[in-house]
């Protein structure tokens, strides 16, 4: 019981300074401006970086001190959209600044955790590819898996409530509520494709969404890790984390939710989350996976008021199932090896069956992505990039080389690279056709005139691609992961990887 109480009191004991006064500090907006200049290439440039100045910031702060109007009245929000096409610079600036302020508690928690554990910071710079060695170690020993789509909250208030454990400043939460209430529809459904935050303030939206996912996973994994210490009897679960230990102490006196859930233990359950999805895998029977499925559905419904249909969560055998994971088509492939054994004068052959994680390059989705951005047609035949024909030759070649290098870098861990070479061929020929179109010539004539050295930059050897080597996280394996495949210096996923 004490372990439960200590776990939850840890969040209570974290005291931070008030965040609300920071919104009146000029340095916050300067920091947001600097981050905007260095933002990822995947985020749209909304024009805020070019128009921000110290004079505008001071004018914004003076306007916020007004008592009658916070920024712009609700009646004017239709003409000056908060996340529209930059018609309201003040609203955009304050939302960028507020996103920086909300990140402060998370940054302080990360720094304190690194100082307490004395963790080498370079080990925390792992890329997304560091997930694959974990799958290689765990998944071949499992039998069933479910690809689960993490549901989005229906009500924006749920996103605000998930921050109440890390932000001890009620004024900041009220300010966030004011943003959402003043400029958005309260009942708007947040979806990954049509999010209200998608174009303008991705930083704030991602922070809210990641907080929501972190809240969901922290409760789920906490219950999972502590399941071995609980009796296998049915009981009513308190999902409110600050009152969970009360349920352990008083199992009969208090009832919060009417639904009775069965808690069960499975020492072989594995959980991986990525891009708004999660994979739940187990070595046990399909019956236990079915229990986990209905447990997740009731968990989302009771705690986050999110309805998810159980029929959309499918349980698949890993031998017969390929799942799309971070742009790769991953599956468990049996590898049979013949071993000859000899005992005295008798010798015999044994078939040794080993399971191996197979990661394939997604050829068809990648061709569809290239066709969408006009590098080829739907059949994979290269075409010229007409929108780049006005650029200089060096810029055209540089852009194609950069795209090909990023794809080669990202998919260098593929089990079979023949499909990757086909994509690189499409990019090379599309580059040549674009140059030939610019110079009003044919591909054959253009290559004959300039020679084969034009495209030498495309033929970068895979061994020359920079890779980061880190030791495995598993304590049972002390050796370095020697294959230069998964530990790469990739910090984000290119748009071409998002096939959906």
From Swiss-Prot:
Predominant subcellular localization, coarse grouping: plastid
Subcellular location as annotated: Plastid, Chloroplast
Molecular function GO labels: RNA binding
Designated name of the protein: Maturase K
Membrane-spanning segments: none
Designated gene of the protein: matK
Stated role: Usually encoded in the trnK tRNA gene intron. Probably assists in splicing its own and other chloroplast group II introns.
This protein's record includes keyword Plastid: yes
One of the GO biological process terms: mRNA processing
Pfam assignment, any one: Intron_maturas2
Family that this chain belongs to: Belongs to the intron maturase 2 family. MatK subfamily.
Coiled-coil portions: none
InterPro entries per UniProt: Domain_X, Maturase_MatK, Maturase_MatK_N
UniProt GO cellular component terms: chloroplast
Native source species: Argentina anserina
Keyword terms of this UniProt record: Chloroplast, mRNA processing, Plastid, RNA-binding, tRNA processing
